[in-house]
From Swiss-Prot:
This is Epsilon-conotoxin TxVA. The modification 4-hydroxyproline is found at P63. It is found in: Secreted. The keyword rRNA-binding does not apply. It comes from Conus textile (Cloth-of-gold cone). InterPro entries: T-conotoxin (IPR031565). The modification 4-carboxyglutamate is found at E51, E54. Pfam families: Chi-conotoxin. Keywords: Bromination, Calcium channel impairing toxin, Disulfide bond, Gamma-carboxyglutamic acid, Glycoprotein, Hydroxylation, Ion channel impairing toxin, Neurotoxin, Presynaptic neurotoxin, Secreted, Signal, Toxin. Glycans are attached at T60. O-glycan consists of the disaccharide Gal-GalNAc. Expressed by the venom duct. The keyword Lipid biosynthesis does not apply. It comes from the Eukaryota.
Amino acid sequence: MRCFPVFIILLLLIASAPCFDARTKTDDDVPLSPLRDNLKRTIRTRLNIRECCEDGWCCTAAPLTGR
């Protein structure tokens, strides 16, 4: 239990540390914003498909009944 306050203080110090890149930026670096946009678009599409499949009217992968 003596280590717990020290652990909390270290967590607070880590969270309040200024953000910086450990590596210097080179010409090869790709900005992450297009990758994040693609990820958001993919997740949004998957969620729309899942909602659609729950309704059962547009899901092409729905199991066939009567087998």
